[in-house]
UniProtKB/Swiss-Prot annotation:
Classification of source organism: Bacteria, Bacillati, Bacillota, Bacilli, Bacillales
Entry similarity comment: Belongs to the thymidylate synthase family. Bacterial-type ThyA subfamily.
Name of the protein described by the UniProt record: Thymidylate synthase 1
Assembly and oligomerization: Homodimer.
Any one Gene Ontology BP term: methylation
EC number(s) per entry: 2.1.1.45
Organism: Bacillus amyloliquefaciens (Bacillus velezensis)
Main location class: cytoplasm
Active site: 112 (nucleophile)
């Protein structure tokens, strides 16, 4: 994607606020507690909720671990990334990783999107995302949109222009139960992409709230229901 427009589906309505809330839960709160997500009126992780109320050592848990050394102290992956992008932009090590082999068995679900790599070149922030697995009906539209939002957020708080956005998928698939509705979706009219407004006053990554995002002129087809595969 060249980022001339926001990558969001128009052939059906995407629950874009839910996608951003999940992003904030993982990247900003660095939480694995499903109750934190429920407080945002989001329930997409409820069926993976364990007895302790969490999804185990997955997603936000990995980002919140203080395992990087910075100025004599330990910080987590997100804080390290933000610092390095600002202070060492030419580094080829701007990477976050959710795939921790030592803790995969402690995760309610192994991460689908597991890695980001960031590049700064000529004042622009580029992002490459890697997903081991993406179902095209549900997971892909969510992930492609929300990580593009993340790129825009981090570009804003680090002071860079928006660069290219790459989303790599190892295993891209369609579930049999989704085929009929996907055929309907494929026949639908596509509309021009909306404009994503992000509050320009926010300069700290941890100050973003859902109220700092607006989709302007989001024209889309009717909602299509797809059963969540478990």
């Amino acid at each position: 994607f060249d980022n001339s427009e926001v990558p969001i589906l128009t052939t059906k309505k995407l629950a874009w606020k839910t996608a951003i809330k999940e992003l904030l839960w993982i990247w900003q709160l660095k939480s694995n507690d499903v109750n934190d997500l429920n407080k945002m009126s989001v329930h997409i992780w409820d069926q993976w909720k364990q007895e302790d109320g969490t999804i185990g050592h997955a997603y936000g848990f990995q980002l919140g671990k203080k395992n990087r050394s910075l100025n004599g102290e330990k910080v987590d992956q997100v804080d390290y990334l933000l610092h390095q992008l600002k202070n060492n932009p030419s580094s080829r090590r701007h990477i976050t990783m959710l795939w921790n082999p030592d803790e995969l068995d402690a995760m309610a679900l192994t991460p689908c999107v597991y890695e980001t790599q960031w590049y700064v070149k000529h004042g622009k922030l580029h992002l490459e995302v890697r997903a081991r697995s993406n179902d095209m009906a549900l997971g892909n539209p969510f992930n492609v949109f929300q990580y593009n939002v993340l790129q825009r957020m981090i570009a804003q708080v680090t002071g860079y222009e928006l660069g290219e956005y790459i989303f790599n998928i190892g295993d891209c698939h369609v579930y049999t139960r989704h085929i009929d509705n996907l055929k309907i979706q494929m026949e639908r009219e596509q509309f021009e992409a909306p404009e994503l407004w992000i509050n320009p006053e926010v300069k700290d990554f941890y100050d973003f709230t859902i109220d700092d995002f607006k989709l302007i002129n989001y024209k889309h087809g009717d909602k299509l229901l797809f059963e969540v595969p478990v």
